């Protein structure tokens, strides 16, 4: 009898670590994994042709070496879907995305697949709903066996006609599709009104799904962060500085409000976008970037800077090098 008991105990000792290792990480653990991130590939010609890519394999390695933990891949996918074939995503599109996921993962970077079709969805939610749900049906099937370092973000910045009430309906339908094949994969969801910090109370998450990370975006004050941007009414307003005590206190107050919501609802927070347009004075860009990143980290949030290249620039493609002041603001040098 004693021999039998000893045998059973030895078996339990052996299998317990195996069972523990197979338990999925919870959303808070996974949020730590995201850590410090950056938005990539949204407007890169790589989606037209791999031969035209600005972002190369080496950039994944450079991001990791610089101290980043994750990438948020911005996917403008609707143009790559075949209307006459049930909105099927093209093989070339999936091949490109597979390459990016593979190279990011190989370099130890967590990956967020962010459906970035916010403008189209905002203009006509009903007319684009079929595409929206078809996208997640295909992507969730395609990546059902991907490592748990691959995250899904249902939609970037729902806004305008995609109201809080309608958004709560749409994301739940997409989430149900995802959960069919990805029951424990982390899904990132943010509030309507451009993932605004002021609209979290209108986000109605399913209480029984704890594999969700909540995202907010932060560009306040817009007159500073978007000065000189061609798509805004700030096109000709440049030279605006940032960094007074009052301005810092405003950021801190907004983040404290988000953190209070997060504690009340027991949800981790991912600051999915922040930054200042590259026509803002560099010293103020640095102050703003550093302050927002450090304040987010003080609350235990993960974050992703907007963005790697193009505007809000972190990497200068022409010079093939980092914009060092912004890099150091994001990833301070350890002493």
Set out the residue ranges of the language-model regions:
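Acidic/histidine-rich helix-loop elements
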Residues: 40-57, 77-90, 223-250
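Surface-exposed, active-site-proximal loop segments in enzymatic domains
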Residues: 46-51, 77-95, 116-131, 284, ...
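Aromatic-rich peripheral "rim/lid" segments of glycoside hydrolase catalytic domains that contact
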Residues: 281-335
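Bacterial N-terminal signal peptides
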Residues: 6-17
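Active-site region of glycoside hydrolase catalytic domains
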Residues: 24, 133-247, 252-276, 298-304
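N-terminal carbohydrate-binding accessory modules
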Residues: 20-72, 87-88, 261, 327-329
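An active-site-proximal structural segment forming one wall of the substrate-binding cleft
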Residues: 60-69, 88-117, 122-151, 167-181, ...
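Short, acidic/polar
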Residues: 49-65, 132-136, 251-257, 288-293
């Amino acid at each position: 009898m004693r021999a039998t008991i000893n045998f059973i105990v030895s078996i339990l000792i052996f299998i317990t670590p195996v069972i523990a290792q197979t338990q999925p990480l919870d959303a808070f653990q996974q949020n730590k994994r995201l850590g410090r991130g950056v938005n990539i590939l949204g407007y890169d010609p790589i989606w037209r042709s791999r031969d035209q890519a600005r972002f190369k394999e080496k950039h994944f390695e450079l991001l990791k070496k610089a101290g980043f933990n994750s990438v948020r891949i911005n996917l403008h996918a609707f143009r790559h879907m075949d209307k006459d074939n049930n909105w099927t995503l093209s093989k070339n599109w999936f091949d490109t995305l597979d390459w990016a996921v593979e190279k990011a993962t190989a370099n130890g970077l967590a990956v967020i697949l962010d459906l970035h079709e916010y403008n189209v969805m905002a203009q006509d939610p009903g007319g684009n709903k079929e595409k929206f749900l078809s996208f997640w049906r295909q992507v969730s099937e395609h990546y059902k066996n991907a490592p748990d370092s691959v995250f899904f973000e249902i939609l970037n910045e729902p806004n305008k006609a995609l109201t809080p009430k309608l958004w709560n309906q749409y994301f739940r339908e997409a989430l149900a599709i995802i959960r069919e094949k990805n029951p424990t994969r982390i899904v990132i969801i943010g509030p309507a009104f451009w993932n605004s910090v002021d609209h979290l109370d209108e986000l109605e998450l399913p209480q029984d799904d704890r594999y969700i990370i909540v995202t907010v975006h932060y560009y306040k004050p817009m007159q500073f962060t978007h000065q000189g941007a061609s798509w805004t009414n700030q096109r000709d307003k440049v030279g605006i500085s940032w960094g007074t005590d009052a301005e810092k206190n405003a950021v801190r107050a907004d983040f404290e409000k988000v953190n209070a919501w997060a504690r009340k609802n027991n949800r981790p927070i991912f600051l999915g976008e922040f930054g200042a347009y590259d026509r803002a004075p560099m010293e103020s860009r640095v102050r703003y970037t550093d302050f927002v990143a450090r304040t987010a980290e003080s609350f235990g949030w993960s974050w992703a800077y907007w963005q790697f290249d193009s505007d809000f620039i972190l990497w200068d493609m022409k010079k093939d090098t980092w914009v060092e002041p912004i890099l150091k603001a994001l990833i301070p040098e350890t002493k």
